[in-house]
């Protein structure tokens, strides 16, 4: 309901502003416009907090709001408007964000963002495309970051065979090492797997990843592979790809996966959903993902938001 209220309120203000432009003009219009913007921001901040919505009083993000389980707000694509965008999320129903490290610098940046914003938490790890930078010293840096009170996962880590480099053997080595780190520090793991279904599963099974727990981010495989991950009690990160017309295999998998094993994600700034495909992505696009899942599941959008938030809090211990 709070998403509907937000949309209605913003559309009302848009029409009202057009009316005032014609009725007034010049400096008087500017003053009225500034007043409306202040009022709008205040009300949009309060709407998601109606009916006991808001912070849980424990500094763990806002409850009963959309939970963004995978974003990269440290990415340079956000350098021009990062603060403005992040400050606007609560007003659009986004309550909690997990910022994911893709390399050592990104992992450290994720921790800094988590320190700066109460609703942001960090995951630290090295993406398979970045493992050439890893070393024993790098693993020690990750281990130290895992001790931060706002780090809730190890990752993203895994295998990506879309490009020939880094070599598969090197990816496998550091994937296994990061799984071992997650087990050591008792944190869930964020898995990246592209065009590497069998090898990813083999390594996870060999290292008993089911005992570690985690999420397969940006899940893109068929429902048969989903069954394997369900057997390990893993969650599934579903993002903008679910809105693509050619995502038939993923849509069948999402219909098969229980709602209590799904997390909402964007992978911002990548993989924007329809109708913004190709543009920079952000958590503001999560309602499109929630709506697509709701349609496939035959439930309300709010039911998806509430279930996925509950799932994410369970996984990340928030």
Region roles according to the model:
Residues 39, 44-46, 51-52, 56-318:
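Mid-domain alpha/beta scaffold segments of enzyme catalytic cores
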Residues 3, 9, 13, 17-20, ...:
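Short hydrophobic targeting helices and cationic amphipathic motifs
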Residues 28-29, 300:
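The N-terminal extracellular segments of secreted preproproteins, especially immediately downstream
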Residues 23, 31-34, 42, 57:
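Short hydrophobic alpha-helical segments enriched in small aliphatic residues
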């Amino acid at each position: 309901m709070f998403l509907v209220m937000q949309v209605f309120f913003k559309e009302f203000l848009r029409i009202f502003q057009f009316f005032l432009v014609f009725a007034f003009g010049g400096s008087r219009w500017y003053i009225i416009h500034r007043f409306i913007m202040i009022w709008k921001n205040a009300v949009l901040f309060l709407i998601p907090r109606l009916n006991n919505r808001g912070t849980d009083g424990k500094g763990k993000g806002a409850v009963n709001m959309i939970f963004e389980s995978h974003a990269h707000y440290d990415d340079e694509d956000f350098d021009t408007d990062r603060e403005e965008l992040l400050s606007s999320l609560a007003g659009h129903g986004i309550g909690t964000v997990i910022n994911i490290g893709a390399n050592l610098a990104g992992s450290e940046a994720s921790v800094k963002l988590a320190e700066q914003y109460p609703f942001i938490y960090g995951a630290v790890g090295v993406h398979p495309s970045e493992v050439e930078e890893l070393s024993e010293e790098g693993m020690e840096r990750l281990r130290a970051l895992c001790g931060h009170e706002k780090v809730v996962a190890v990752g993203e880590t895994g295998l990506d065979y879309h490009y020939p480099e880094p070599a598969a053997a090197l990816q496998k080595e550091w994937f296994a090492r990061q799984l071992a780190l997650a087990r050591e520090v008792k944190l869930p793991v964020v898995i990246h797997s592209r065009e590497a279904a069998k090898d990813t599963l083999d390594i996870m099974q060999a290292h008993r990843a089911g005992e570690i727990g985690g999420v397969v981010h940006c899940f893109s495989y068929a429902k048969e592979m989903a069954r394997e991950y369900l057997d390990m009690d893993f969650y599934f990160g579903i993002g903008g790809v679910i809105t693509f017309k050619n995502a038939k295999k993923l849509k069948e998998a999402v219909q098969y996966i229980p709602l209590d094993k799904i997390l909402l994600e964007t992978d911002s700034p990548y993989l924007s959903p329809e109708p913004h495909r190709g543009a920079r992505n952000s958590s503001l696009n999560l309602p499109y993902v929630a709506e697509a899942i709701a349609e496939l599941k035959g439930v309300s959008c709010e039911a998806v938001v509430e279930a996925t938030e509950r799932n994410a809090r369970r996984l990340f211990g928030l």
